[in-house]
Design a protein with these regions (language model features):
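Sec-dependent N-terminal signal peptides of Gram-positive bacterial secreted proteins and lipoproteins
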Residues: 2-24
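Electropositive phosphate-/nucleotide-binding environments in soluble metabolic enzymes
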Residues: 68, 169, 286
């Protein structure tokens, strides 16, 4: 009886084990087949990632081509320095972007830099001002050379020094009002745009994008800083306050100072601040690095320029682990570019480790669709008198 019971129990156990094992094997087989079913969706995920990149460019950088390699590089770099888990992470209080102005944020061929255009207007086309014969002749030769696309005439003084002298005695408010009046003039060589509107729309969107990613934005330009502040206030003032604008410096004096050294003079409450008529420093090349260090104490996280005048700023950025980009003046359809010059500049940038931005290929528009280049290579006498 006991023997029969044992046999029965063993038989029952074997039956149960067989059912369980069969069920387990079936489960294992089903699990093993599962990856085959998810292989195709994995490929779909990869294509979604590529689409998301183009979406990021169009959403984050307005007016940039969706296939722009430069835009892709900028976005990837910004991601790396803003991600706390990245080895490239830069804390918000150290996250800075430095921009040149002329040819980087703003056009420089109207037919020349904005501050030079302002100087020429003052010397040649301002009926309220009578310049010296020497300066009038210099200005006329310079304007003629610019319109003819010829080298600038030689001069004992830089155009910046001349500009400082012809605005001597202006108060800051008078100077800013004069600048703003000129900003309303039509930009030479274009229709549908004033001097105050001559900013590169893709670069303005880049400034906004960097600000949204908690970069502190600076302008570091060779232009005199009061001109810079007034010119950029309407378009860039939302993201770049006056104290973040670095430029060349014109000397100042108090109304009653009369040549007394500033270290030995104290002004009264009713004295006005006046421009004294001299260029103190020109913010170019290595001077840009000195200005960045002295005025901000910052090491650039990212910087943007467009000429050899920005090479030192770019090198300083790279030396501190940042990235530097240079614009190429390679668009001859929408702007007054120079293909040969752009190609040579691109080669030099590659040697120095700078990435380049093609105005022709990377920008969907430059000044806006309502702005057209007039294709003017020279100017007639009626236009010059305007």
């Amino acid at each position: 009886m006991l023997k029969k019971l044992i046999v029965t129990v063993l038989a029952f156990s074997l039956a149960v084990c067989g059912t369980a094992c069969s069920s387990q094997n079936s489960s294992i087989e089903t699990t093993a087949e599962t990856p085959k079913e998810t292989t195709e969706p994995a490929e779909t995920t990869e294509s979604v990632t590529e689409t998301a990149t183009e979406t990021e460019i169009s959403a984050g950088l307005e007016y940039w081509a969706e296939n722009s390699a430069a835009a892709q590089s900028i976005i990837e770099y910004v991601k790396s320095v803003t991600d706390e888990n990245s080895e490239n992470f830069v804390p918000v209080n150290e996250r800075t972007a430095f921009f040149d102005l002329d040819g980087t944020l703003y056009g420089e061929l109207f037919p020349t830099y904005f501050d030079q255009c302002l100087m020429l207007h003052r010397l040649l086309h301002d009926s309220t001002y009578t310049p010296t014969e020497e300066y009038r002749e210099y200005a006329q030769q310079l304007e003629d050379a610019l319109f003819a696309h010829e080298p600038e005439p030689d001069s004992d003084k830089s155009s910046a020094q001349v500009t400082a002298e012809i605005f001597k005695g202006f108060t800051p408010d008078e100077y800013k009002a004069y600048i703003r009046d000129f900003m309303s003039e039509s930009a030479y060589g274009f229709e549908g745009m004033t001097y105050g509107e001559g900013f590169y729309k893709p670069m303005v969107s880049l400034v906004e994008y960097l600000s949204e990613n908690d970069f502190t934005i600076f302008i570091c330009s060779g232009m005199e800083r009061t001109i810079l502040r007034e010119l950029t206030k309407d378009t860039l003032g939302e993201w770049i306050p006056p104290q973040n604008i670095i430029g060349s410096v014109f000397s100042l004096e108090s109304e009653g100072q009369d040549g007394t050294d500033g270290r030995k003079y104290n002004c009264s409450q009713d004295e006005k601040l006046l421009f004294e008529g001299n260029l103190v420093s020109k913010n170019q090349k290595m001077n840009k690095v000195f200005s960045i260090f002295n005025e901000t104490g910052a090491e650039p996280t990212i910087s943007f320029g467009n000429s050899s005048g920005d090479f030192s700023m770019g090198t300083y950025t790279l030396r501190n682990g940042g990235k530097s980009y240079m614009l190429l003046c390679d668009d001859i359809e929408r702007d007054y570019g120079d293909i040969e010059k752009a190609e040579e500049f691109a080669e030099k940038c590659a040697e120095l480790g700078f990435e380049t931005i093609s105005m022709k290929s990377d920008f969907l528009t430059i000044y806006g669709e309502n702005v057209t280049k007039t294709e003017t290579d020279s100017v007639d006498e009626e236009d010059k008198a305007a």
